[in-house]
From Swiss-Prot:
HAMAP family xrefs: G6P_isomerase
Active site: 353 (proton donor), 384, 512
Keyword Isomerase part of the UniProt annotation: yes
Gene3D superfamilies per the UniProt record, alphabetical: 1.10.1390.10, Glucose-6-phosphate isomerase like protein, domain 1 (3.40.50.10490)
Subcellular localization: Cytoplasm
Keyword Isomerase: yes
Protein name according to UniProt: Glucose-6-phosphate isomerase 1
Gene: pgi1
GO MF term set: carbohydrate derivative binding; glucose-6-phosphate isomerase activity; monosaccharide binding
Recorded GO CC terms: cytosol
Pathway: Carbohydrate biosynthesis; gluconeogenesis; Carbohydrate degradation; glycolysis; D-glyceraldehyde 3-phosphate and glycerone phosphate from D-glucose: step 2/4
Function: Catalyzes the reversible isomerization of glucose-6-phosphate to fructose-6-phosphate.
Domain of life (superkingdom): Bacteria
């Protein structure tokens, strides 16, 4: 038994589950005409319908009691106050300070961090204006037309997702490119599209030692210098987001063009910081500020709304209901908007790197499930790929259906078809189709007898598949900021319930350590390290293939 599983609310929910697991949402809707109105809420430009979940008032009552018994109120306050809730690294967790639009003091070790936050935002704004206005010129006195962001993980996924999502708001002269993969192909193909005279490289690495990022950055630098043939020109075409001024200067980047962030900003929560420089360059300072404003709206709601009307808390606790009671090991993100095509990958890192943990804060092994596998694709594409499994497969995979009510970028007639599919899928997942309904349908098609009965089981949909429908008034910087912050806080809440640290990522370290040794073997700097027979054979195959 762990701290969590000993809580009275945890045990009470198991008693409730014994009855609730037999309920069907179709019956719940039939018995309660007001269900949709009661199980929905709006925050800023976001509307959440969570009525199509396997929940009742008793379920929600039990889940909110579990949140309180797990200490969620105190943990929310601790995060916003700047307490060092990342215990394994002894750090505060203050991505919320980066969008603290009230500018009220937030202290770390007694120091108000807001002056530094505002100073970096001001520098970012001035630089973005210079690039966007054409005042910032390359080594041949031409304005910048292409921006190549070089980073990985949180230094790539966040800026890439936001720039893709808000493309209609981007500067018409600027083309955005993102390079993260160290395989060489991504950088090679990117460099084919850009010109050294008009390209700005943004190198994003907190330590400026990340192997993948530095490998790509050095290769980009070599490519640039092969054309510019002047080391001094690097300063006009490379800027850095880092904390390592010495390494940045050695690279050839003017320290005046290094934008700082801090150890209380986790990588996957960093797009609000200087890591968001590519976003500001592309969208402009005003739109970046709107992104922050949207996140701040959700922050204030999360801090102040009662749990029963708190959007992040509701999503988190309903998620706990499926993960820990129904055994639902995956969760689907299905945005019905092509501009949001990178959102599933972004949420995947945000959730799985945060809560994919096997021990509690006290270091004890968990005796319950933690983070689900997050996956997904744009909704329409998903319907023709994996929705078959979601409708008739054997897994319980809750689905977030995300769309915008207004879409200024859509072509005439397209948006209505899109939204019809969103609403239809939510209804289909909930209702399903009974055997009698299938028989009636087949009878209308002229089938009967054995021929009909042979088809019936294949065309039955069990329904009772949970969905959340998240609708934005429109996809714009403010609403996207709120949406991202919603998921950040949902993930935080689940981490609190499970008594785990959502803000470290030790699981990524072992592979990095082993890769250094194996790299030395592949490049001939080390003859043979100790490995298992499989790894040794793989190394031998590489050596044989490469002479």
């Amino acid at each position: 038994m762990s701290e969590l599983t000993e809580l009275p609310a945890w045990q009470a929910l198991w008693d409730h589950f014994a009855e609730a697991k037999h309920l069907h949402m179709r019956d719940l809707f039939a018995a309660d005409p007001g269900r949709a109105e009661r199980y929905s809420l709006e925050v800023g430009g976001l509307f959440l319908d969570y009525s199509k979940n396997r929940i009742t008032d008793a379920t929600l009552l039990g889940l909110m009691e579990l949140a309180r018994e797990a200490g969620l109120p105190a943990r929310i306050k601790a995060m916003f106050k700047g307490e060092k809730i990342n215990r394994t690294e002894n750090r505060a967790v203050l991505h919320v300070a980066l969008r603290n639009r009230t500018n009220s003091p937030i202290r770390v070790d007694g120091e108000d961090v807001m002056p530094k936050v505002n100073s970096v935002l001001e520098r970012m704004g001035k630089f973005a204006h210079a690039v966007r206005s054409g005042d910032w010129l390359g080594f041949t006195n031409q304005p910048i037309t292409d921006i190549v962001n070089i980073g990985i993980g949180g230094s790539d996924l966040g800026p890439l997702m936001v720039c893709s999502a808000l493309k209609p708001f981007g500067h018409p002269r600027l083309n955005m490119h993102f390079v993260s993969n160290v395989d060489g192909a991504q950088l090679k193909e990117t460099l084919k599209k850009v010109h050294p005279e008009t390209t700005l490289f943004v190198v994003e690495s907190k330590t400026f030692t990340t192997q993948e990022t530095l490998t790509n950055a050095l290769t980009a630098r070599e490519w640039f210098l092969s054309h510019a043939r002047d080391e001094g020109a690097v300063a006009k075409h490379f800027v850095a987001v880092s904390t390592n001024q010495k390494a940045v200067a050695e690279f050839g980047i003017d320290p005046a063009n290094m934008f700082e962030f801090w150890n209380w900003v986790g990588g996957r929560y960093s797009l609000w910081s200087a890591i968001g420089l590519p976003i500001m360059l592309y969208l402009g300072e005003e739109n970046f500020t709107e992104l922050l404003n949207g996140a701040h709206i959700m922050d204030q709601h999360f801090m102040n709304a009662p749990f029963e009307q708190n959007m992040p808390v509701l999503l988190a606790m309903i998620g706990v209901w499926y993960i820990n009671y129904y055994g639902g090991g995956s969760h689907v993100i299905a945005p019905y908007d092509q501009y949001l095509h990178r959102l599933p990958a972004f949420i995947q890192q945000l959730d799985m790197e945060s809560n994919g943990k096997q021990v509690t804060l006290s270091g004890q092994p968990v005796d319950f499930e933690t983070a689900p596998i997050i996956w997904g694709e744009t909704g329409i594409n998903g319907q023709h790929a994996f929705f078959q499994l979601l409708h008739q497969g054997t897994h319980i995979s809750p689905i977030d259906l995300i769309a915008s009510l207004g879409n200024r970028a859509s072509l005439p007639g397209h948006h209505e078809i899109l939204l019809a599919n969103v609403f239809a899928q939510a209804e289909a997942f909930m209702r399903g189709k009974t055997a009698d309904e299938v028989r009636a349908e087949l009878a209308e098609q002229g089938l009967s007898g054995e021929e009909m009965e042979a088809l019936v089981p294949h065309k039955v949909f069990g329904g009772n598949r949970p969905t959340n429908t998240l609708l934005m008034s429109r996809l714009d910087p403010r609403n996207l900021g709120s949406l991202i912050a919603l998921y950040e806080h949902k993930i935080f809440v689940q981490g609190v319930i499970w008594h785990i640290n959502s803000f470290d990522q030790w699981g990524v370290e072992l592979g990095k350590q082993l890769a250094k040794t194996i790299h030395a073997e592949l490049t001939g700097k080390l003859e043979q390290a100790e490995h298992d027979s499989s790894t040794r054979r793989l190394i031998q195959l590489y050596r044989k293939a490469n002479g």
